Amino acid sequence: MSDVAVAADTTETPAAPTKASKATKASKATKASKATKAKTTKVPMVKADAAHPPFINMVTEAISSIKDRKGPSRAAILKYITTKYTLGDQANKINAHLRKALNKGLESNAFVQASGNGANGRFRLAEKTASVAKSPAAAKKDATGEKKATTTVAKKAATGEKKATTTVAKKAATGEKKATTTVAKKAAAGDKAKKTEVKVKKVKSPKKIAKSPVNKVTKSPVKKIAKSSSMKAAPKKAAAKPAKKAPAAAPEA
């Protein structure tokens, strides 16, 4: 016999699978499939964002933005919302939603019908909704504007307080310096003035005698006494007679 024949004889033929082995395999397969199903978590369906807000909001925005004395008509509202938002090409559905929104607004007293009946006519906003109705973009802008305003006001207030405190401190410091310098100067000047006053009191300056104006003696005119005729001139005294000379002595013999 050849080597190939011996090898063929030595290999054992596999045993035929029994029914029990088939059942165990099937049960294992089902359990594995259930485990895989349990492991796979269900992915939640993510709803796509709507391309436009609800029709009632769009209608209120259109009525508030369209400026018409009589109020905007349904055609004007439709034109506004179709130009601003992407509503698609199905005009019948758009008109149906618009009519429903108008009727709903009239029932809830959000809109006031200026003229016409039902969805056909002109509309105005009620007083309550007119003050509340704003576009979402405008509301966001208002919110951002308020935030910016508050931040800028807070920053300005903080800087203003810092500047005010620094300026007040500087002014107070300068005021104190000025006050001290002025007080010191005034005190020094006061001391000097007191010293000078004391010196002046010690040294008595001679009093100047005010010269009284000399009374000019007015010469009174001498009154000439008129010689009255009664007054006679006093008699002149007789001239003294010369004394008689003594007789000369006779010569001696």
From Swiss-Prot:
Residue ranges constituting the H15 domain according to the UniProt record: 51-127
Function of the molecule: Histones H1 are necessary for the condensation of nucleosome chains into higher-order structures.
GO cellular component: nucleosome; nucleus
Compartmental location: Nucleus; Chromosome
UniProt-listed InterPro entries: H1/H5, Histone_H1/H5_H15, WH-like_DNA-bd_sf, WH_DNA-bd_sf
Record bears the keyword Nucleus: yes
A GO term for molecular function: structural constituent of chromatin
Organism: Caenorhabditis elegans
Protein name: Histone H1.4
Biased composition (Low complexity): 1-33
